[in-house]
Structures are given as structure tokens and as C-alpha cells.
């Protein structure tokens, strides 16, 4: 990663807030919308596909990182290969903490969800370049500052004092698995085999 991003995992302790700035999955979703425009137009209106093609242009990582630091964020990491799930795993592993995440709180655009449903992919395992994963003792303050600047941000969970990496969706609890290959590779297998909806 470039100089904008400086993970400080040693400063991360249990009971800190985990924040996402930007929307997840947008980088790979935009790639898929550009490369499979014709296929997506068989299900979605043209304006929707055009918007999906521009998903990667919805925010400045540099501005978000600078604002976050001013708001007390101690860990900032660009969400890349393997998506937000890989980023969360790396955070927990490098900090030596557990994590407890509310899936519904992770910012994601409907366009990303629809593109992923079309190709039967997991949007939380897509590259999300330009989206930042952060940790702060006061996540609400950092998220509010980012939102005020027009950057979508939300507290998605907390670090914990054990090694469990928990993802919650309503009453369902699952445990995060070690990162696998980026879902974009599955997309290429899918389109090469014609195996999509």
C-alpha cells in the first residue's frame, strides 16, 4: 500500500470500534459491470448498469484517511484483495484480537449487491480499493466526521479480547474463515464457462 495507509496494529486493543469508510466490493463490481455490460443489461436497466460501471469513482481514499486520523483513528488499512472479509481477518491476526462484526452495518451499494447476485459471488470478498478499514476508541466520532464530508462510513463492530472472528447477521452467527482467492477470479471462471443466471 502507498504512504496514505499505515496500519498500526500494535496500538489496537480489545473493545475498540471498527469502522469502514467507503463502500465495499466497489472496485471489482465496477470491473464486472464494465466487462459484462451486455449480460447485465439482460436483467437490469441501462442507467443502473451505467451507475455500476462508475462504482469505483465514489470517494477519495486520501481525504478519508486524513480526516480519520484527525478524528482519533489509530489504524487505517486499504481494503484490497479478498475484500472486507480478508481485511478484517488481517486486522484481527495482526492486532492479536478477536472481532465481532454486524454484517448489516457494512456500507455497500445496491449496485454491488445486484452485480454479485447476477454472477453468484460474495460481495464481501471482492476487492474494494479506495475503501478503508479503520480502528478507533471512538468510532462514532470518526464515522460522523467522514459522513459530514460526504464519505459513507459506519461503525461495523468491535475488537474483542479473544481470538474469535465473529460475523453476525440478525440472529445468525458465523465465524470468519481465513482469506481465500478474490471473488473476481470466480467471476472470470464463471463468464468463461457461461455459468451465470
Spans of features found by a protein language model:
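Helix-biased detector of long, well-ordered alpha-helical tracts
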Residues: 1-197
Amino acid at each position: 500500500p502507498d504512504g496514505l495507509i499505515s496500519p498500526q496494529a500494535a496500538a489496537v486493543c480489545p473493545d475498540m470500534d471498527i469502522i469502514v469508510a467507503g463502500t465495499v466490493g466497489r472496485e471489482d463490481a465496477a470491473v464486472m459491470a464494465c466487462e459484462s455490460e451486455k449480460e447485465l443489461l439482460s436483467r437490469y436497466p441501462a442507467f443502473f448498469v451505467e451507475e455500476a460501471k462508475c462504482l469505483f469513482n465514489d470517494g477519495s481514499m486520501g481525504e478519508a484517511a486524513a480526516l480519520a486520523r484527525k478524528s482519533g483513528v489509530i489504524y487505517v488499512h486499504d481494503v484490497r484483495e479478498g475484500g472486507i472479509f480478508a481485511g478484517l481477518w488481517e486486522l484481527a491476526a495482526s492486532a492479536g484480537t478477536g472481532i465481532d462484526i454486524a454484517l448489516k452495518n457494512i456500507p455497500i451499494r445496491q449496485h454491488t449487491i445486484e452485480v454479485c447476485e447476477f454472477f453468484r459471488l460474495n460481495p464481501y470478498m471482492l476487492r474494494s480499493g479506495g475503501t478503508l478499514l479503520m480502528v478507533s476508541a471512538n468510532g462514532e466520532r470518526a464515522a460522523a466526521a467522514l459522513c459530514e464530508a460526504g464519505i459513507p462510513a459506519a461503525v461495523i463492530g468491535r475488537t474483542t479480547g479473544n481470538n474469535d472472528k465473529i460475523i453476525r447477521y440478525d440472529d445468525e452467527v458465523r465465524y470468519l474463515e481465513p482469506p481465500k482467492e478474490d471473488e473476481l477470479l470466480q467471476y472470470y471462471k464463471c463468464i468463461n464457462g457461461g455459468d451465470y443466471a
